[in-house]
């Protein structure tokens, strides 16, 4: 019986994917699909962009990891991405089955290329780049340690012995975890959370060149279950937030000790992720196993501002756009990345539109056929997103401009089409 149900589900997923491919020319200005050798649990853009004279593309980079079988070597990876520089360079908008893309850029054969592989001990649960130094990458590992890699001090090809040699190992946790966050305003300050119910903070600038390990500067305790995610505030350099399986959102201030300053039961189920708004200092979003994304005002955490409802399964990642104050995206087990525009909350809808989703649901990316593990807004190109899923696929995509620019007929038509994909 289970096998029959799985077969039916697989057929449904494949049919949805075919529908998505048919509609990509109307929904996207760009889609690039790249099959990785192994699934990546993490993806993050490097905030660097190189343009070349007389070339129809720019060169950007993303960091990835591997999640291999137990017998295979794991890697932290840096990939080079060729992105079209403007609409004039984009070929006719049709989905190319052989290349897996919309919006090609001429004769560039490899749009995505792995240019550096660094041996890693176990799978890379998450990898994030330091904002102040783009060669410094922190990784969450399958052990209790957090690794720091300086990519300039590692060869482009991994050493054949498979030895993992991070430039620094950060200690303090007792178990593995996923959440990790660099302080955008204090260089070297790193937060990590863990299944051991704790949050650790390090200042890696305190490590001498001879140090191979660094103990946590502070350990924060307040959660009563697994801490799933942690994030520094973008504006106030002593504030951070955390969420966990105890259903709690906690706000902390490093100046007041190691206990939270605000605690709220944020959802009816485990809380898996959070994101502070880079523009509005009081706005924070949380995503949960209860399938919703919640919006909160830090000045009044007793009352939820709004619930974003469209996902059909657990929400595992949420991120505000670095370019637009009212835009955020979320992803999860339903194989979808939803893009939301909070400025549209409360807009009037007819019954047909309301059946397709709330007015603030701007876009549904339906290009993956398995649970989406992570996504990342491109800091260099507004509306460009990279996403990775358990189907080994890395996709880099940008919704059609008429969807986010036009608030009337074009938006309505695009949203109806897109809603059909999400059915």
Swiss-Prot record:
<dbReference type="GO" id="GO:0042393">
    <property type="term" value="F:histone binding"/>
</dbReference>
<dbReference type="GO" id="GO:0046689">
    <property type="term" value="P:response to mercury ion"/>
</dbReference>
<feature type="repeat" description="WD 5">
    <location>
        <begin position="310"/>
        <end position="350"/>
    </location>
</feature>
<feature type="repeat" description="WD 2">
    <location>
        <begin position="172"/>
        <end position="212"/>
    </location>
</feature>
<dbReference type="InterPro" id="IPR022052">
    <property type="entry name" value="Histone-bd_RBBP4-like_N"/>
</dbReference>
<dbReference type="InterPro" id="IPR050459">
    <property type="entry name" value="WD_repeat_RBAP46/RBAP48/MSI1"/>
</dbReference>
<keyword id="KW-0677">Repeat</keyword>
<comment type="subunit">
    <text>Probably binds directly to helix 1 of the histone fold of histone H4, a region that is not accessible when H4 is in chromatin.</text>
</comment>
<keyword id="KW-0678">Repressor</keyword>
<keyword id="KW-0805">Transcription regulation</keyword>
<dbReference type="GO" id="GO:0006355">
    <property type="term" value="P:regulation of DNA-templated transcription"/>
</dbReference>
<feature type="repeat" description="WD 1">
    <location>
        <begin position="119"/>
        <end position="159"/>
    </location>
</feature>
<feature type="repeat" description="WD 4">
    <location>
        <begin position="266"/>
        <end position="306"/>
    </location>
</feature>
<dbReference type="InterPro" id="IPR020472">
    <property type="entry name" value="G-protein_beta_WD-40_rep"/>
</dbReference>
<comment type="function">
    <text>Core histone-binding subunit that may target chromatin assembly factors, chromatin remodeling factors and histone deacetylases to their histone substrates in a manner that is regulated by nucleosomal DNA. Component of several complexes which regulate chromatin metabolism.</text>
</comment>
<protein>
    <recommendedName>
        <fullName>Probable histone-binding protein rbbD</fullName>
    </recommendedName>
</protein>
<dbReference type="InterPro" id="IPR019775">
    <property type="entry name" value="WD40_repeat_CS"/>
</dbReference>
<keyword id="KW-0539">Nucleus</keyword>
<keyword id="KW-0853">WD repeat</keyword>
<dbReference type="GO" id="GO:0005634">
    <property type="term" value="C:nucleus"/>
</dbReference>
<dbReference type="InterPro" id="IPR015943">
    <property type="entry name" value="WD40/YVTN_repeat-like_dom_sf"/>
</dbReference>
<dbReference type="GO" id="GO:0006338">
    <property type="term" value="P:chromatin remodeling"/>
</dbReference>
<feature type="repeat" description="WD 6">
    <location>
        <begin position="367"/>
        <end position="407"/>
    </location>
</feature>
<keyword id="KW-0235">DNA replication</keyword>
<feature type="repeat" description="WD 3">
    <location>
        <begin position="222"/>
        <end position="262"/>
    </location>
</feature>
<dbReference type="InterPro" id="IPR001680">
    <property type="entry name" value="WD40_rpt"/>
</dbReference>
<dbReference type="Pfam" id="PF12265">
    <property type="entry name" value="CAF1C_H4-bd"/>
</dbReference>
<dbReference type="Pfam" id="PF00400">
    <property type="entry name" value="WD40"/>
</dbReference>
<dbReference type="GO" id="GO:0006260">
    <property type="term" value="P:DNA replication"/>
</dbReference>
<dbReference type="InterPro" id="IPR036322">
    <property type="entry name" value="WD40_repeat_dom_sf"/>
</dbReference>
<comment type="similarity">
    <text>Belongs to the WD repeat RBAP46/RBAP48/MSI1 family.</text>
</comment>
<keyword id="KW-0804">Transcription</keyword>
<keyword id="KW-0156">Chromatin regulator</keyword>
